[in-house]
């Protein structure tokens, strides 16, 4: 059951204590709306200073792995995450279809999810999607490695509905096997059927994590939250239906939770 902010504050220490004590902890975090506020220009998104500080503290601890798990394609996630080649932070892009590990090798493939690419000219499909939204004010198409996304954050409700109808019709006709996802002012289609649950499972196996902390703010994050194990902890950032055990109001409040987790885990290792 989700909790409101007051309940979360009361029970925070109790919720974090098992994670602070676990032998190997994976801290997996969505990026947009979770570490960084949602903004109109997606490539300008950056994690809040408090988020960066908490992440650095966690990543510096022994037996503690930090990962960004995002719907962004891997290349874009590295840009907004200010991610260098020597970074200790793991990445899962495209909802778990692309990976980057600290060895520096990008695992640019679907990790456990099916794909549907037969008879689909993805480049032509993206180009036609661009044409559809060209005369719809505020709507635009984000090209992704395994598909595309319709953004309507800056559109009126009427224009957003029109763009959604026309893009849906295009994909039904041309790529009916592609996975459809909805989020906050976004409609995404992908040839990969992988979800963030797949990403968490892959990262858990890769890192040998004995417990997982996962936080996210959108519908696609619920794939991961719903598949967490009993010893894990899911946190929902902001409003919306969720199966997360805890809820925080926004990215700033989550940064405080991450900082608390870092302090508690560091104390366990003194």
Show where each model-derived region lies.
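Short loop/turn segments at strand-loop or loop-helix junctions that form parts
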Residues: 29-32, 95-96, 151-153
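Conserved Rossmann-like nucleotide-cofactor binding loop
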Residues: 34, 74, 220
